[in-house]
Amino acid sequence: MPFIDLQTNLPASLFTDDFLTRFCSAAAAALGKPENRMNLVVSPGLRMLIAGSSSPCVMVAVSAISVTDTAEKNKEHSAKIFEFLTKELNLSDDRIVIQFHELQPHQVGKKGTVMSFL
């Protein structure tokens, strides 16, 4: 059950329902998870800096159980997510940063319990 949180200073008009669907699909494929398990939030129009510049940029946080637990896995995930975002948003790769957070099953609640019991 991955969680993707994309924050950006790009305008909301770029983030259509179609973009969200395509990003969800790309992120699911990158992480090897089914699309119906993905959770995605896009927060556009923020005041942001990356590397001291307020030029168009994106920060992404990826939190997931058992798929973000090694540098090797995250390197692969990063490459696929960067490929999608650079093409879709016309950004250079130095204007995108990704944070990976490993979650444990007891840290994710669903259906009135936690994933440890589902």
Language-model features: locations:
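Interaction-mediating elements
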Residues: 1-118
